[in-house]
């Protein structure tokens, strides 16, 4: 049995308003949540304060992105200092939508990781291949390069969670089979052992994202190297509670 605490992040993406999020938060607050699982809710920037005020203390709050410096003339951006000021303690960085919709590079993501960690904000660092890359047989090459860009900027791994999200399985209804997901998670752990340290490889949580639902979570969560989930669409529904409790 792994000593790594199960970690479930809900990425609300650009969804919700105060009315619908209040309903969701009330459902989460009244739900029976496993004490053995760390739960983080990724709210839209404009609702970080709102989410932190309304969610019970057993839930942490995460931003979905931040910039690589503390302040300045960067219109539309937010800093880790602002995230903390809202009572949030995590940030999602390198999500495939940031990479592929907004053109963020490995280098920029690495710089963001370094700055967030220097400000003591926890990082959920996302990696994952696109369908054409998987079909070309370069899944490992892609995810190792993305992981290296993150790892090169990490001094203290206790504040980092890695999220493997095969891009072809995000919001598509396609899910990597538990075996496919486990295979990549195992390879990532081996990469960490070789390139960072055995201790980090054993302790860092590697979570899975990509169309995780109440129906798929138990089998995925049973894999030895899958330490939780980063959940998109299903995190806005009551079934998020089932996903949080996947190990029960």
UniProtKB/Swiss-Prot annotation:
It holds the Pfam family TIM. It catalyses: dihydroxyacetone phosphate = methylglyoxal + phosphate; D-glyceraldehyde 3-phosphate = dihydroxyacetone phosphate. GO terms for cellular component: cytoplasm. PROSITE patterns: TIM_1 (PS00171), TIM_2 (PS51440). GO terms for molecular function: methylglyoxal synthase activity; protein homodimerization activity; triose-phosphate isomerase activity. Pathway: Carbohydrate degradation; glycolysis; D-glyceraldehyde 3-phosphate from glycerone phosphate: step 1/1; Carbohydrate biosynthesis; gluconeogenesis. It is found in: Cytoplasm. One of its GO terms (biological process) is glyceraldehyde-3-phosphate biosynthetic process. The keyword Chloroplast does not apply. Keywords: Cytoplasm, Gluconeogenesis, Glycolysis, Isomerase, Lyase. The active site is at residues 95, 165. Substrate binds at residues 11, 13. The keyword Flavoprotein does not apply. Its EC number is 5.3.1.1, 4.2.3.3. Triosephosphate isomerase is an extremely efficient metabolic enzyme that catalyzes the interconversion between dihydroxyacetone phosphate (DHAP) and D-glyceraldehyde-3-phosphate (G3P) in glycolysis and gluconeogenesis. It is also responsible for the non-negligible production of methylglyoxal a reactive cytotoxic side-product that modifies and can alter proteins, DNA and lipids. Homodimer. Belongs to the triosephosphate isomerase family. This is Triosephosphate isomerase.
